[in-house]
Regions:
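Short solvent-exposed strand-capping/beta-turn motif centered on an Asx-Ser/Thr pair
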Residues: 50-54
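Intrinsically disordered, low-complexity Pro/Gly/Ser/Thr-rich segments with frequent PxxP/GP/PP motifs
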Residues: 66-103
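Short, solvent-exposed loop/turn segments enriched in Ser/Thr/Gly
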Residues: 39-46, 99-101
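C-terminal interaction-tip segments
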Residues: 1-40, 108-128
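Beta-strand signatures of extracellular beta-sandwich domains
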Residues: 60-64, 119-121
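Short acidic, glycine-rich loop/turn motifs
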Residues: 63-67, 108-110
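Short acidic, Gly/Pro-enriched loop/turn segments at secondary-structure junctions
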Residues: 55-59
Length: 128
């Protein structure tokens, strides 16, 4: 029988804190990693992004690959977030164990630090 547990994002928000997206298009911020080699463990990731700045920002999520992996670029999701707006940007994107460091990363299309903050949680599903 499968078990379900809710956890904070890891590695970025282990205490439930928000994760500020830093730098720009060439540097990714790790949002969540599925650090298991067990292929019966799935991470269902829920993320909300808030723009605390005064201008719109394009948030780019890279879903499902390792650091700088081509697979993640193929699964790129773009969101335009207006000032003082919060968007639900990951409605349960699911990543699976089987290789370590399968993750979700984020970056901004513009060079503005910490004006977009991500909060969220992970439902860990163990089917073993």
């Amino acid at each position: 029988m499968a078990t379900f547990t809710r956890e904070c994002l890891s590695p970025g928000a282990t205490q439930g804190n928000g994760i500020g997206i830093v730098v720009n298009g060439t540097t990714e911020t790790d949002i969540h990693e599925c650090n298991t080699a067990t292929d019966t463990i799935y991470h269902e990731v829920h993320l909300w992004a808030t723009n605390i700045g005064t201008s719109a920002h394009t948030l780019i999520l890279l879903v499902g690959g390792e650091d700088n992996a081509a697979a993640a670029v193929a699964q790129q999701k773009n969101f335009i977030i207006q000032p003082n707006e919060t968007l639900y940007v990951s409605p349960g994107f699911t990543i699976r164990g089987a290789s370590t460091h399968v993750e979700i990363q984020a970056k901004l299309a513009t060079n503005t630090n910490n004006e977009v903050v991500i909060h969220g949680h992970v439902n860990v599903i163990n089917q073993s």
